[in-house]
Amino acid sequence: MTIRKIYQIAFFIAFLLPGKSNGQISQGGIPIQINKQKSASFTTDLVVMPAIDNLKMRDKYSRTDQNMLKQFHFAHSFDVSLSPNNSGKWYNTSEVNVWQIRIRSTGAYSLNLILHKFRLPDGARLFLIGSNTGEIKGAYTSANNSDSQVLAIEPVSGDELLVQYEEPVGVSFRGEFLIAKVAHDFVGITGDGVHRPLGISGSCNKNVNCDLANGDESIRDAVCRIIIEGTEICSGSMINNTALDGIPYILTASHCIGSEIQAESSVFLFNYEMPYCSPNNPSTDGDIKRSLSGSSLKALFDSINFALVRLNNIPPYNYRPYLIGWNRINTAPAYSSCIHHPLGDIKKVSIDWLPAQTGTFSSGYQPNGFWKILKWDIGVTEPGSSGGPLFDQNKQLVGALTGGSATCNLPTNDYFLKFALAWDYRKETGKQLKAWLDPLNSGASKLTGMYLYSGKMLCKPVTNFKDNDTHAAIQITNGLTKKGYYSGSNLVGFTEFAEQYKFSKNCEVQGVSLGIAKVKTNPLNASSLIGVQVYSGVNQPETLLYTEKFVINRFYNDAMNYISFQTPV
């Protein structure tokens, strides 16, 4: 078999190929910098939320979460009503009108917003910018318009953010949106920077890409982290149906998404994981850019604790969307595994090598309606794991997490809803899975999974890291003199760095994830670019296949940063 070897020039914080950026870039664009002396309308652009005591809020939810359900409360939501018609400031030019408002909730680790009545014309752009970090979310455009007119946005680090709306002169209609909720993070879901602090979930948890999870690559790609109404975190998974038509259904727990408004106000984050195991060096976070906002509720039944929603948008091909296969036969799996996001952390895997038992979760729930894990052999589940899929020995879904008492100190007694019972225990289409996952009425008891873009010959993720490898920013030294970094800014003339990846068959490379230690640049300066090149070759880079430049200030420190090529290679 021919081996195709792809070489890519890695990112360097040496500002490879510096230059000016023009127009739209692949990471979503750069907000316009405006002359603030051209302001009009309102007298203030700062709105401050009522004070919150983070410690008291954490204590409150740690007590309310003692019912064994495993959603993760991390934020308090304020109801507001802020729009370009009643708040903020407008800045007008001959080509574009720009509206800004600043929102502060003192002491928040991060802020997130939920927008209602969201309807933008073509050409308009909306950004959220962290006032302290320069983190940029957006641009949100007419592509984010939906029937629900709801847009939920991932958290922005820090206790103050700037909302900036840009509308070209002469658009077909005036854009509309209402900031309806501001959520104050009292836990630290993004830590002190823009990313979640690692090591917060239990130390017994294992990264999903450790060698012990070999063979789980496909089902791993189906699992997502869900932020519901800006305040809670759960897990969920994309699931296949017998029509094989690629409808993006997500299965989770009903105590996570329990209503249509919660479905509409949810954010689904895919591929939030480490690309390697890193058991002894958990200092690099996963990529947080591949998310989708909004869904519609299709089916729910509380006493079995399942919810099925349909995403408003089909995940793009570079999300690697996989639709999990399932087994609805009510037979205990010989052994079980669960992939989930404990405490909102990067994706983890838990394994029980013994057969699951039938059990009852608690009063108010269907008797004997759950798979009981007596004891985890590897990892556990935690708050934030609710809704995470349970797989049998054939990697088919047989349940989803409701809750339990398992901890790293005592990894016992977790409960997963039975997929077999959720299938058609109730006959109403809004309270069963059968109507949605077997639209052909085929009577199938099992279904295999599939990648949503199976015909595109996409390359599978590859890495050169092994389980026990570590990483560090290595300085170049000459005696006592420090001359910079091997893969960053330096005084010895290193301007490029190559890494070799091997693929067993011809396939499309869609992008690359880069571990960035630190970036220093003006958050709104669009002039600093860095280049990525893809080569083919045998023992060294030989034939240039692709090159693209990226704006440096869109990268996150101490984290994996996924960049998508505008044209797959």
What are the residue ranges of the model-derived segments?
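Serine endopeptidase catalytic core focused on the charge-relay Asp
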Residues: 156-374
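Bacterial Sec-dependent N-terminal signal peptides
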Residues: 1-28, 459
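Aromatic- and Gly/Pro-enriched, solvent-exposed loop/edge beta-strand patches characteristic
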Residues: 378-382, 387, 518-569
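Protease-domain processing segments flanking chymotrypsin-fold serine proteases, especially trypsin-like
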Residues: 24-99, 147-154, 159-240, 454-464, ...
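C-terminal subregion of chymotrypsin/trypsin-like serine protease catalytic domains
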Residues: 250, 278-291, 298-300, 308, ...
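Beta-sheet-rich sandwich/jelly-roll-like modules and their strand-loop junctions
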Residues: 455-539
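Short, surface-exposed beta-strand/strand-loop-strand elements in extracellular ectodomains
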Residues: 120-134, 526-537
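Catalytic nucleophile loop of clan PA
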Residues: 237-247, 379-402
